Design a protein with these regions (language model features):
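His/Asp/Glu-rich metal-coordinating catalytic cores
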Residues: 1-115
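Hard-cation-handling environments
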Residues: 77-197, 202, 257
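Glycine-rich phosphate-binding "P-loop"
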Residues: 57-74, 139-146, 223-237
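Active-site neighborhood of phospho(di)ester-bond hydrolases with catalytic His/Asp-centered motifs
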Residues: 9-12, 31-36, 56-60, 91-95, ...
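Proline-aspartate-enriched helix->loop->beta-strand connector
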Residues: 246, 250-256
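Short acidic, glycine/proline-enriched helix-loop-strand junctions
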Residues: 265-288
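Redox- and metal-dependent alpha/beta enzyme cores, enriched for Fe-S-associated oxidoreductases
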Residues: 187-223
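A short, acidic, amphipathic alpha-helical segment used as a generic capping/interface helix at domain edges
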Residues: 177-186, 234-248
Length: 291
């Protein structure tokens, strides 16, 4: 509590610990979503709607729809097995907090016989996660998956990992980290493959790999003649999830943020008849006047 204001945190479903912020004043109630997912993922439970007067909602995937998560996870595992069956290594670039841990959970559950190595900042982040088990969905399973993986802690471990079935490592957008070291060595064998499971921003190494088949490696733009597969394992709600979440919060006013113009407009079109929708630009101040 701050004076007559009260603040509460609610699980946002994006990653463990991600929170929506509810601000209750004597005149109005505001909910700030942050990054949210309205579906369960391996390590985080879905965000639940919170009744409010003003909803500030992310629109990352406005106008876009996700395939069912179970379907996409099954496609990911099947592709991993295909690469391993031909004697290759599947390299999975992963974000340090969220995606890497989800990948470990999926692999531990579906293909526990595989030799999976875990490298990069994600190993340290996971240890921090495990210090707050109450925030992790089925925390015991995350503990088991982490212990099951072979953590890379030095150069000798990294060389051993080149013979693994799967390498999960940072960075998720191929802009640095151990993934560059692995790519430089695995690129020489066509039996290996790269599995992209996260968004690749414009200008990132991952985007360059997708569009040009090349990547900067230690200062040199290098061809990467490996198969590159993309999987949508996003921890953001899609258009339908965002729309239903907004309706269930029952706000009078909706403020959309973190969205492209192509994402904001479909949400505006769908929800404008049910609530007042604002589309502010970056650096544009908004004054909230209770009504």
């Amino acid at each position: 509590e701050v004076g007559t204001w009260r603040c509460r945190l609610h699980g946002a479903g994006h990653i463990p610990g991600a929170a929506m912020v509810e601000i209750e004043t004597p005149e109005t109630r505001i909910l700030w979503s942050g990054d949210i997912d309205t579906r369960d993922s391996p390590n985080a439970g879905a965000a639940s709607p919170v009744d409010c007067d003003i909803l500030c909602l992310e629109g990352t995937y406005g106008g876009r729809h996700h395939k069912p998560r179970a379907e996409e996870e099954a496609r990911f595992v099947a592709r991993i097995l295909e690469v391993v069956s031909r004697g290759g290594t599947a390299l999975v670039p992963a974000f340090a907090s969220g995606r890497g841990q989800d990948i470990l959970r999926i692999l531990h559950k579906e293909v526990p016989n595989l030799n999976v190595h875990y490298d990069g900042m994600g190993t340290r982040v996971t240890k921090e996660w495990l210090g707050c088990p109450e925030l992790i969905r089925d925390a015991d399973r995350m503990v088991k998956a982490f212990r099951w993986s072979k953590r890379v802690t030095g150069k000798s471990d990294r060389k051993k990992a080149l013979d693994a079935d799967v390498i999960v490592t940072t960075s998720g957008m191929l802009d640095g980290g151990p993934v560059i070291w692995y790519l430089n060595r695995l690129r020489h064998s066509g039996s290996n493959a790269i599995m992209l499971t996260g968004y690749q921003a414009e200008g990132s190494g991952g985007r360059k790999l997708i569009e040009e088949g090349k990547l900067p490696i230690f200062g040199t733009l290098t061809p990467i003649p490996l198969e590159v597969d993309k999987f949508n394992l996003s921890n953001h709600a899609d258009h339908e999830g965002l729309s239903e979440f907004a309706r269930s919060c029952n706000p009078k006013d909706l403020i959309l943020f973190h969205a492209t113009e192509g994402g904001r407009q479909p949400l505006h079109t769908e929800l404008a008849e049910e609530m007042t929708v604002y589309l502010p630009l970056n650096n544009e101040p908004i004054t909230i006047i209770p009504r």
